[in-house]
């Protein structure tokens, strides 16, 4: 009995010793202690606890709290270093440059007129006026003068290509979007204006390429007849090409800039946007309900793809006063109806207003199709165009039929009509490359004649 009591007391003492050791370990900050033997419990705290409890707060907490603000501060400093917050110390009477240039990336500039910082964008052609001191150049944007660091200026065009020539139809909406993009990219040399509204309230655009104050002018029209809309795509591509190469490309030894600074192009790329829409999509795309319903009535079963007239069945190229209502159709329809009175249509009025405003020296009319050209007499112009296109000469004669050419002839304005592509219109899209290749230099060549 006594031996049994002694044994129980010994076990209790050992157990109390283990509990005391565990309690001591917990009070000294030990959290992870394996429940194995007394030796493991006493050895681990001495080797691991001081390192784990002291290193964690010293290495992680200060670094996390101090590093983040240092990084953001550096970025903020980098952003502001390229932005002149005050007028740079620059003498603006520097070396003349006077040509188009671009910036290598979006950068800040100082607007001298508004006395504030603004941004100039990559992919936009600016008129670089002067190279000044202290690493700055003076550029012009409209009537504004901006100081930009010279190191950011390049004279190689970095504008994105805009006109999509793979588009088989190339609609009025496509042209409208592209005109806006072109004017943004090349606003220093290209201006887009509106001469009026069509019957279905589409804008009648015309563009001025080159020096708007140039004394000589070449006027160009395309897509007077609805189904001839490929000429709009070709013309829009030519406009973009001339803008992209304005300060770098040459035609027969003369820079584009030299030619177009002295002889401007005024182009109406889609004279008949309602008609083009009808030819491409049918009357369903005409927004005005009365016009739409009337189109179905006057069509006479004709496939709308071959539509030539405007939205009320009047042929714009028969609506001029000279020879008005001579021949042609007697009722509204898809072609050759002159209307009730001359110059009755908004599209005709728009053309007349632009011609009277710009007073062109020469006019080029693009139609389709047949690869022929019409002109009143053999001239230096017609001979040059033949050498470039090899389109067959056709003398139009003295009889008038209310066409735009008749209107021009009556005012002694030299003109020539080029019929691109092969019949019938609308010309197949596979003909586009040949049309473009044959005619891409026509306008710059005509302009060069007037230097």
Model-inferred region functions:
Residues 31-74, 79-81, 85-86:
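Long, intrinsically disordered low-complexity tandem-repeat segments
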Residues 229-230, 237-239, 243-374, 378, ...:
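Active-site/substrate-binding loop(s) of hydrolase catalytic cores
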Residues 132-134, 141-144, 149-155, 177-183, ...:
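Active-site-adjacent structural elements in enzyme catalytic domains
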Residues 18-30:
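Sec-dependent signal peptide cleavage junction
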Residues 105, 113, 125-127, 164-166, ...:
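C-terminal accessory segments enriched in acidic
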Residues 193-196, 205-207, 217-221, 231, ...:
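Structural recognition of the beta-strand scaffold that forms the well-ordered cores
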Residues 31-33, 87-136, 140, 151-158:
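Beta-loop motif signature
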Residues 157-200:
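Short glycine- and acidic-rich boundary segments immediately preceding or forming the N-terminal edge
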């Amino acid at each position: 009995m006594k031996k049994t009591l002694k044994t129980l007391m010994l076990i209790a003492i050992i157990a109390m010793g283990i509990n005391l050791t565990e309690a001591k370990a917990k009070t000294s900050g030990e959290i992870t202690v394996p429940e194995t033997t007394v030796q493991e419990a006493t050895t681990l705290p001495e080797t691991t606890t001081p390192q784990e409890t002291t290193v964690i707060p010293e290495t992680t907490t200060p670094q996390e709290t101090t590093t983040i603000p240092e990084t953001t501060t550096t970025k903020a400093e980098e952003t502001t270093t390229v932005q002149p917050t005050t007028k740079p110390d620059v003498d603006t009477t520097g070396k003349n440059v006077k040509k188009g240039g671009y910036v290598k990336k979006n950068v800040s500039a100082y607007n001298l007129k508004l006395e504030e910082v603004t941004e100039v964008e990559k992919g936009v052609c600016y008129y670089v006026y002067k190279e000044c001191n202290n690493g700055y150049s003076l550029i012009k944007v409209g009537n504004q003068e901006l100081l930009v660091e010279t190191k950011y200026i390049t004279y190689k065009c970095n504008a994105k290509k805009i006109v999509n020539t793979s588009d088989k139809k190339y609609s009025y909406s496509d042209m409208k979007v592209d005109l806006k993009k072109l004017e943004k990219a090349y606003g220093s040399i290209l201006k887009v204006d509106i001469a009026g509204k069509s019957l279905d309230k589409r804008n009648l655009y015309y563009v001025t390429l080159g020096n708007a104050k140039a004394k000589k002018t070449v006027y160009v029209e395309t897509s007077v007849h609805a189904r001839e809309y490929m000429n709009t795509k070709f013309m829009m591509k030519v406009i973009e090409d001339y803008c992209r190469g304005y300060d770098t490309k040459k035609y027969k030894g003369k820079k584009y800039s030299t030619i177009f600074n002295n002889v401007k192009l005024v182009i109406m790329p889609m004279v008949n946007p309602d008609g083009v829409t009808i030819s491409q999509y049918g009357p369903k795309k005409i927004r005005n309900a009365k016009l739409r319903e009337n189109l179905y009535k006057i069509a006479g079963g004709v496939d709308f793809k071959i539509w030539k007239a405007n939205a009320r069945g009047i042929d714009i190229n028969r609506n001029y006063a000279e020879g008005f209502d001579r021949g042609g159709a007697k009722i509204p329809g898809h072609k050759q109806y002159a209307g009730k009175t001359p110059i009755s249509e908004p599209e005709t009025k728009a053309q007349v207003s632009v011609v009277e405003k710009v007073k062109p020296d020469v006019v080029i009319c693009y139609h389709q199709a047949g690869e022929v050209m019409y002109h009143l007499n053999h001239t230096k112009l017609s001979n040059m165009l033949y050498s470039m296109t090899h389109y067959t000469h056709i003398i139009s004669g003295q009889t008038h039929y209310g066409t735009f050419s008749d209107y021009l002839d009556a005012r002694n304005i030299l003109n020539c009509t080029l019929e691109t592509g092969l019949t019938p219109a609308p010309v197949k899209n596979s003909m586009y490359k040949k049309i473009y290749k044959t005619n891409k230099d026509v306008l710059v060549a005509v302009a060069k004649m007037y230097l």
